[in-house]
Amino acid sequence: MARKSRKHIAEPIFTSVSPFINTALYIRLSVEDNKKRGNSIETQKMVLKDYLSNKPEFRIYDTYIDNGTTGTNFNREGFQRMLSDIEAGKIDCVIVKDLSRLGRNSIDSGYYIEQYFPSHNVRFIAVTDQFDSENPDNLHGGIILPLKNMINEAYSLDIGRKIKAQ
């Protein structure tokens, strides 16, 4: 009688992986930004859709918009709805026009970019800042990313002071 091998031969495991990257477009417009044509909701949508136009692997899951809300507070309706969808595993990537659209609070922005999104396996892209969290050679990481977030926060504080002085 032949002996049975003690070596375990692994059975192949087949998993269903979507060929698409479910993508959230996040757009924020503050009251002050509303005066600037370059940050309008329509302009932001155009920039994001133009960025995705030659990237067929990205599928827009939803567009989350916060209109007339400050970037210093992350308790925004559209942003919170996006976080709920991330928690539910519906989103693989978040794309914004630039880092200031995510927020103007350097600590909270850093938390979402460096901790929250990676812990939920969510890729983060800031189009005009040329930041993509999936790119290991990203020169905008390291010291540049926190520096840009601090500049965005300082800008918000400066605008707040100017408005109060009027």
PLM features per residue range, with description:
Residues 1-166:
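Short, structured surface patches at the beginning of a domain
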